[in-house]
């Protein structure tokens, strides 16, 4: 398949692992990737990508971030992604966000006067990486406590662990009566295009009411994330 696509002259191919929910009764049997099979697939994708770099000067074949997470492999550096041509498809999203946060923090003045706590909810897959990114923000804003909470996807179940499929109901169930601080942030990918309804038809207002907290919706942009987190109380 890789060779066939290469012959067609495609500009870029993104390869992502299948995500299986608990709602698969009567459907074609599919096997979810584990650490071993994810690593094998990743080796194959990177092999073809490296060959394309030698032939054409560009990678063409990219693996989704989830393959690196499942294979327990480090996320490649930003240069690997050649300008992030498929970041919206989950290709290099973690590396891109981290780089943007680093640039935004580098341009920020040191400020230890801001003193408050916020919570950032996300899917289980990205939580460890997001926690590391929040440490970068802490280098310039040491008294802002940013608590990253991984939300288990009980609604879809199975191996679904990405932020974009977290539902409002799961947010409410898992964050109820928790100390969330002064604001709760979520990525905009959790919401439908109107940016006010989750996939389970729970609204932003429902979550704010049930958790008694203001909800901040942040796009997958490091500069915006740093700005939002550091301006809760100015």
Regions found by a protein language model. Name each.
Residues 3-14, 19-234:
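Auxiliary Fe-S-binding modules of radical SAM enzymes
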């Amino acid at each position: 398949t890789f060779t066939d696509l290469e012959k067609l002259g495609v500009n870029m191919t993104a390869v992502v692992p299948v995500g299986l929910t608990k709602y698969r009764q009567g459907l074609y049997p599919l096997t979810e990737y584990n650490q071993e099979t994810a690593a094998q697939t990743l080796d194959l994708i990177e092999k073809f990508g490296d060959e394309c770099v030698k032939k054409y000067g560009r990678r063409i074949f990219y693996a989704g971030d989830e393959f690196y997470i499942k294979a327990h492999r480090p996320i490649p550096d930003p240069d690997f992604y050649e300008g992030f041509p498929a970041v919206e498809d989950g290709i290099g999203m973690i590396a891109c966000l981290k780089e943007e946060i680093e640039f935004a923090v580098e341009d920020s003045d040191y400020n230890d006067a801001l003193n408050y706590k916020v919570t950032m909810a996300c899917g289980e897959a990205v939580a460890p990486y997001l926690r590391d990114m929040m440490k970068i923000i802490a280098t310039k804003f040491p008294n802002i406590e940013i608590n990253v909470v991984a939300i288990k996807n009980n609604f879809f179940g199975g191996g679904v662990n990405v932020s974009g499929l977290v539902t409002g109901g799961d947010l409410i169930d898992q964050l109820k009566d928790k100390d969330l601080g002064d604001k709760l942030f979520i990525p905009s990918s959790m919401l439908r295009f109107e940016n006010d309804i989750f996939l389970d038809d729970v609204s932003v207002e429902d979550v704010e009411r049930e958790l008694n907290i203001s909800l901040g919706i942040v796009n997958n942009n490091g500069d915006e994330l740093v700005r939002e987190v550091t301006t809760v109380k100015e």
